[in-house]
C-alpha cells in the first residue's frame, strides 16, 4: 500500500497521516464542507498522473506526451457535463475560489460592480468580502437575509440591483440552510442586464442528485468545488449551459490565473463524477437531507434555535445566544467530546467574528459513514448535552465515550464499500 511506502521513506509525515486517519475514524465530523472521498478517488489522486505537466487543454497542449492525461481530462469534462446537464465544463480550477476568480475576470473589469450575499449572512469570502481579491478588485454590494425569517430577502436583492445596476450578480452561500430560488435570481439579473453566476460549492452533490434545483438552466455561469457534498477530491469546477462562454472562461483559467493543471486531481474528479452518476449516489444525497432535517428537528425540540427554523439541504446554522454560549466555546467543548464542527457567525451577529454566536452543522460525513435518522436523534442529544453542560468535564468525557462507540459502529471505510 502507498502508506507503507510512505512509512518506510518518511516516518514523520507517515505518522501525521496515521494520526489523521485515527482522528477521522474516532471523531464525528459535523463540518458541513467536509466529506470522505472514496478509495478510488484517492487512488486516482495518488497516481503517476502527478508526474505530468500538461499546460493547455485536451488536444491543445504546450507539452508532449499528453495523450493519456488528455483522455483523463476529457472523461472528467464529459462526465461533468452529463452530471449537471451543462454544455460547457472546465475541470482545471485548483479550488472553488480560483473558479470564481476566473469567472469574475471573464465577466468583469476591475472596478465593475457586483452583487453578492453578505459574508455575515452566510455568503462566502469570494462574493465580495473586502479581505478577498473579489472585494479588493471589484465594487461589490451585498444582500442578506430577513431578520424575522432568516431567509434571503429577494426584495432587497431586486432593490439593490435596481439601484446599483451590477454587471454581475452571484448567488450561493457557505452557511445558508434553505433552497436557493435560482429562477428568481435570474429574473432579477435579467431586469438590470446583469450576468448571473451561481456558486453551488456547498450544494453541488445535492444538485447532481436532483435533491436541490439546478442552477445550470438559469445561470450564465456556475462554479463549484468538487469535494463537500460532491464527495470528490479538493478542487474546483466551472459549468455553463452556454457553450459560447467556453473560450473566454478557458483562457481565464489558463493562461489567466493558472499554469499547469493538476492532472492527478482531474483524474480523481473524473472518478468522483462517475460515482455521482450512480443510483447509489442519488440515494446517498437523499439521505443527507433526511438526516439534516432529522438532526435539525431533534436539536430544536431540545431548545436549540436554528437560523430560518430548520434546513432544506445538508446543513443547519445554530444560534446559541438563547443559551448564552458563544460559537467559539461551543466548538472547543464539542471537539473535546469528539464532535467536530465550526463556529460561525449568525445573521445580525454582534459577537467578534473570531468568537461568533453560532455553529454550523452538516450531515454529509455522518451519512457517508452510514448513519440514518435514528443516529441523528442520538447525535442531537450528545450535542445538546455538551452545550448545556459546557464546563462539565464529566459530561464531556461521557459524551466522548459515546461518540467513540458510535464511530466504531460506523467506520469511515468499510471493506465492502467504495471507500
UniProtKB/Swiss-Prot annotation:
Among InterPro entries, the record links this protein to: PyrdxlP-dep_Trfase, PyrdxlP-dep_Trfase_major, PyrdxlP-dep_Trfase_small, Ser_HO-MeTrfase, Ser_HO-MeTrfase-like, Ser_HO-MeTrfase_PLP_BS, SHMT-like_dom
As its record notes, the protein acts as a catalyst of: (6R)-5,10-methylene-5,6,7,8-tetrahydrofolate + glycine + H2O = (6S)-5,6,7,8-tetrahydrofolate + L-serine
Instruction: Report the family membership.
Output: Belongs to the SHMT family.
| PROSITE patterns xrefs | SHMT (PS00096)
Q: Where is this site: Plays an important role in substrate specificity?
A: 227
Record EC number: 2.1.2.1
**Keyword Cytoplasm in annotation:** yes
Pathway stated in the Swiss-Prot or TrEMBL entry: One-carbon metabolism; tetrahydrofolate interconversion; Amino-acid biosynthesis; glycine biosynthesis; glycine from L-serine: step 1/1
Its needed co-factors are: pyridoxal 5'-phosphate
| HAMAP family named in the record | SHMT (MF_00051)
Lineage, highest ranks first: Bacteria, Pseudomonadati, Thermodesulfobacteriota, Desulfobacteria, Desulfobacterales
Q: Which GO terms describe its cellular component?
A: cytosol
PTM annotation (N6-(pyridoxal phosphate)lysine): residues = 228
What organism is this sequence from?
Desulfosudis oleivorans (strain DSM 6200 / JCM 39069 / Hxd3)
Q: What is this protein called?
A: Serine hydroxymethyltransferase
On assembly, the entry states:
Homodimer.
Q: Which CDD domains match?
A: SHMT
Q: Where is the signal peptide?
A: none
Q: Its GO biological process terms? A: glycine biosynthetic process from serine; tetrahydrofolate interconversion
List, alphabetically, the PANTHER family matched. SERINE HYDROXYMETHYLTRANSFERASE (PTHR11680), SERINE HYDROXYMETHYLTRANSFERASE 1 (PTHR11680:SF35)
UniProt-annotated location(s): Cytoplasm
Q: Enumerate the UniProt keywords alphabetically.
A: Amino-acid biosynthesis, Cytoplasm, One-carbon metabolism, Pyridoxal phosphate, Transferase
Binding-site residues for (6S)-5,6,7,8-tetrahydrofolate, renumbered to this chain = 119, 123-125
Q: What is its main location?
A: cytoplasm
The function of this protein is:
Catalyzes the reversible interconversion of serine and glycine with tetrahydrofolate (THF) serving as the one-carbon carrier. This reaction serves as the major source of one-carbon groups required for the biosynthesis of purines, thymidylate, methionine, and other important biomolecules. Also exhibits THF-independent aldolase activity toward beta-hydroxyamino acids, producing glycine and aldehydes, via a retro-aldol mechanism.
Q: Which GO terms describe its molecular function?
A: glycine hydroxymethyltransferase activity; pyridoxal phosphate binding
Amino acid at each position: 500500500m502507498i502508506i507503507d511506502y510512505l512509512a518506510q521513506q518518511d516516518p514523520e509525515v507517515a505518522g501525521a497521516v496515521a494520526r489523521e486517519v485515527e482522528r477521522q475514524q474516532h471523531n464525528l465530523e459535523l463540518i458541513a464542507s467536509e466529506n470522505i472521498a472514496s478509495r478510488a478517488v484517492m487512488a486516482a489522486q495518488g497516481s503517476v498522473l502527478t508526474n505530468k505537466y500538461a499546460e493547455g487543454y485536451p488536444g491543445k497542449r504546450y507539452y508532449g506526451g499528453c495523450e493519456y492525461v488528455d483522455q483523463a481530462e476529457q472523461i472528467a469534462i464529459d462526465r461533468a457535463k452529463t452530471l449537471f446537464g451543462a454544455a460547457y465544463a472546465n475541470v482545471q480550477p485548483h479550488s472553488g475560489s480560483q473558479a470564481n476568480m476566473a469567472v469574475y475576470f471573464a465577466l468583469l473589469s476591475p472596478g465593475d460592480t457586483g452583487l453578492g450575499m453578505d459574508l455575515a449572512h452566510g455568503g462566502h469570502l469570494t462574493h465580495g468580502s473586502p479581505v478577498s481579491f473579489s472585494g479588493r478588485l471589484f465594487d461589490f454590494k451585498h444582500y442578506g437575509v430577513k431578520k424575522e425569517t432568516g431567509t434571503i430577502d429577494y426584495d432587497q436583492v431586486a432593490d439593490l440591483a435596481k439601484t446599483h445596476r451590477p454587471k454581475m450578480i452571484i448567488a450561493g452561500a457557505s452557511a445558508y440552510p434553505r433552497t436557493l430560488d435560482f429562477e428568481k435570481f435570474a429574473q432579477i439579473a435579467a431586469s438590470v442586464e446583469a450576468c448571473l453566476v451561481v456558486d453551488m460549492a456547498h450544494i453541488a452533490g445535492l444538485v447532481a442528485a436532483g435533491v436541490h434545483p439546478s442552477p445550470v438552466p438559469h445561470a450564465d455561469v456556475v462554479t463549484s468545488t468538487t469535494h463537500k457534498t460532491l464527495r470528490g477530491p479538493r478542487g474546483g469546477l466551472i459549468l455553463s449551459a452556454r457553450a459560447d462562454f467556453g473560450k473566454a472562461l478557458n483562457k481565464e483559467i489558463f493562461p489567466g490565473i493558472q499554469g499547469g493543471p493538476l492532472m492527478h486531481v482531474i483524474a480523481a474528479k473524473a472518478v468522483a463524477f462517475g460515482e455521482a452518476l450512480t443510483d447509489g449516489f442519488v440515494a446517498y444525497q437523499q439521505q443527507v437531507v433526511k438526516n439534516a432535517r432529522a438532526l435539525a428537528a431533534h436539536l430544536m425540540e431540545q431548545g436549540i434555535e436554528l437560523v430560518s427554523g430548520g434546513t432544506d439541504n445538508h446543513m443547519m446554522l445554530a444560534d446559541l445566544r438563547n443559551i448564552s454560549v458563544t460559537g467559539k466555546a461551543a466548538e472547543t467543548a464539542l471537539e473535546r467530546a469528539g464532535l467536530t464542527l465550526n463556529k460561525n457567525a449568525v445573521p445580525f451577529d454582534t459577537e467578534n467574528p473570531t468568537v461568533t454566536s453560532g455553529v454550523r452543522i452538516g450531515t454529509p460525513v455522518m451519512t457517508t459513514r452510514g448513519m440514518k435518522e435514528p443516529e441523528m436523534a442520538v447525535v442531537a442529544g450528545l450535542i445538546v448535552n455538551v452545550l448545556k453542560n459546557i464546563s462539565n468535564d464529566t459530561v464531556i468525557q461521557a459524551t466522548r465515550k459515546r461518540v467513540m462507540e458510535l464511530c466504531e459502529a460506523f467506520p469511515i471505510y468499510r471493506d465492502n464499500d467504495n471507500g
